[in-house]
Amino acid sequence: MDFKWLHTFVTAAKYENFRKTAETLFLSQPTVTVHIKQLEKEISCKLFERKGRQIQLTDEGRAYLPYALRLLDDYENSMAELHRVRQGYSQTLQLAVSPLIADTVLPSVMKRYTAMNTETEMAVTIFESAEIASLIKAGEADIGLSCLKVQSSSLSCHCLYKDPVVLVAPPDKRFIEDNEIDAKEVLEQYLLLTHNHPDYWDDLLRQVRMTFPFVRTMKVTQTHITKRFIKEGLGVSFLPLSTVKRELAEKQMIRIPYQSVQLPYAGAYAIALYENKKEKKFLDFLSHFHF
């Protein structure tokens, strides 16, 4: 059996139209018809019947469809596995990673680890920190890298590093030239961009408002968008230092001293359900990595 026939069949079953099937698969309509006829001959049953310009599955076609989908899925998985083996991989490590960690420390971690462990295929999927623990519990990822600490009897949670939170602002000449920058003046002039980190904002914002009740805020839930807004002069924010190191070095932002309260630290955590050989190896690597 030619798997092209199966692919044509399931696509035709989806659209119930040979013309649309041909366009989707970049085939001619006669080729679609030939594929269906060949499959019908192979399995000795009629899969479609015509209703005017449309087609619809016969009872036999409807019964065969889930098996065709399963055959295609098995075929694609087998080809992916062969491709993985050809590349020299003997195992796969699935990571669920928060956007903030993926955008800061993950590239250097991945570069070092993959160079040292060429037999391990790495798969990285980005999720919000609040989702990661449940994904690990469900077995949808081997290790999670999250900005939220997890307290669970079924999960291990390792602190990777603590990142100081700093107040950053656009590179306004007045603030650059002023040796005694006043956080009060900055917060009076700019919007405070909040909730770009899943952990510290509720407590921090409450403390800021106790000292500066006049502060105007805008909720921006992604760190990279917050940084873009700051560089465009839209506002200021409290961000983990690692996320703005480059911008501070390139003078795209300036750091504002903030002494009204003790600013928090933002944590990064590795979460795992099992610590088998491949998970333990990666966790050991993280524990010795210089963040």
UniProtKB/Swiss-Prot annotation:
Classification via InterPro entries: LysR_subst-bd (IPR005119), Tscrpt_reg_HTH_LysR (IPR000847), WH-like_DNA-bd_sf (IPR036388), WH_DNA-bd_sf (IPR036390)
Highest taxon above the source species: Bacteria
Residues in the DNA-binding region annotation: 18-37
Keywords: Cytoplasm, DNA-binding, Repressor, Transcription, Transcription regulation
GO molecular function: DNA-binding transcription factor activity; transcription cis-regulatory region binding
GO biological process terms held by the UniProt record: regulation of DNA-templated transcription
Subcellular location: Cytoplasm
A Pfam match: HTH_1
Stretches assigned to the HTH lysR-type domain: 1-58
Gene3D superfamilies, alphabetized: Periplasmic binding protein-like II, Winged helix-like DNA-binding domain superfamily/Winged helix DNA-binding domain
Primary localisation category: cytoplasm
Keyword Repressor: yes
Cellular component terms per the entry's GO annotation: cytoplasm
Family, as annotated: Belongs to the LysR transcriptional regulatory family.
Cited function: Negative regulatory protein for the citA gene for citrate synthase I.
Name under which the protein is recorded: HTH-type transcriptional regulator CitR
Originating species: Bacillus subtilis (strain 168)
